[in-house]
């Protein structure tokens, strides 16, 4: 009987040791370095952290756009069509620890160079990631569109401080939101009111501005900023990491076009 008890005790000890080992492995995996905008995991270290990314590529974003170096083209040559309805359906809002992100139901899209890109989400960078003639704006909004071939077209709207924006008031009505939290929205809004009155824009080929920094992005950056209030900027800022932007990347002989309407 004592031998039987001893065997049970040995098996129990083996089992406990095994469980402790498993828990240690899980703990280690959960605490692997993850990219951020600060310290040892800031953009300068993304290449080290994200081993299989394009973050060290030659077509990276964002960039500094210098007006005198851009190539003038006509709007009709770029074939950009914004196919948004007056009631774009917002599905949910998430604080993913990097930005505030609004996700959309399927339906809205743009057509760029003959290909359809479907609107999936928009998020914010404060201050802006792209700069124009060295000027960094208080805020940049990215409207992310994806094609069936998994290519991206991102429309960027820069913002400066001034009067209140009705659309921003709507977005911020869902704040505050804690990190790693999602709120269901299931409401609609007219996103076309987000764009500046002057529709001239810059275009160039680049990458996602966050890991994995994939280099299959068409960038459309409206030249004229929109106006939002100081309070709106601060409210958004309080729900995001400080300075959640990536620094200017080398142009590496890429061409930037300025597209104007006739």
Language-model features: where?
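Alpha-carbonic anhydrase
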Residues: 4, 19-262
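Bacterial N-terminal signal peptides
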Residues: 7-15
